[in-house]
Amino acid sequence: MITIACAEGGSTIYSLKKAIEDLGEKCNILLLSSDNLLVDTDFNIKTDLIHSRCGIGDYLDRLTLFSWQVLKNLESEGHYFINPLETIYNSSDKFKTTKILSKNGLKTPKTALIRDYADAKHFLDTKNMNYPVILKNSFSKCGMKVQKANSDDELKKLSKNSIWESKLIQEYVDFKNGDTYKDMRILVIDGEVVGGYRRVSNNFITNLYVGGQIEPLNVSSELEEIALKCSECMNGYIMGIDILPKDGEYYVVEVNTAPGTKGFRSLGIDVDKRIAECLIKYKKS
């Protein structure tokens, strides 16, 4: 039995469940928003492997810290996770992600964890950086709470209460391509790049959740090497790697341990089956 843990349903959840069952394996969904769910000190489930589609993050109205507490409780009961919970946490924390990637030689935007405007200005002065700059919540998801400051006045406004929001300031990587912005999502499953696409938007936030569109991407050997290295140093079995191109260089901005599959399905790439095969492989090992 494989269990998919999620805060809420969605096309990726149900497509993945079907792919697992089509391969002859039982699959259950642990829906953490269910009215029938009771998590007391005796809470446990019967399963051979848990694939969490939850992270710890700032989703506004979604179950986040609660989800994380449930997952950690199940880990304490001896359950096995793909991806590991440590990997999920490290990828949820954008500052931790950037730290790990940069220490392993991957190109990332200059980044600092800030408490207030004074910290933000100190960072800009120390790194000799100019506007614009990006501010984001370290645990933000789906392109939410990502903002651009173009001046001191805007920075002062956007950096207010940063210490209470775990906010980052980050170098702005201008990846505009003509009249649009195009970044890249590459999917790694069990040490293999299985596909990728460009995310296209009229602004610098390209996430599909906030309206970005997709187009096919031919994953070059250089991009493949970057994606595989990201997955390896993050200890990820299933990972979406987000990359910004600029002046012939590639900046890794985020990694995602619960990448959506809808975009790949629209391009005819059956990544649900590949993820299902990965989960079944480690369930049986």
Curated annotation (Swiss-Prot):
Pathway(s) where this gene product acts: Cofactor biosynthesis; coenzyme F420 biosynthesis
> Quick one: which residues bind Mn(2+) 1?
242, 254
Cite the Pfam families for this sequence.
RimK
Source organism, top-level taxon: Archaea
Q: Mention any one GO cellular component term assigned to this protein in its UniProt record.
A: cytoplasm
ATP-grasp domain ranges (all copies): 98-284
Please state the Enzyme Commission number of this protein: 6.3.2.32
Q: Name one GO biological process term.
A: protein modification process
Q: What is this protein called?
A: Coenzyme gamma-F420-2:alpha-L-glutamate ligase
Native species: Methanococcus maripaludis (strain DSM 14266 / JCM 13030 / NBRC 101832 / S2 / LL)
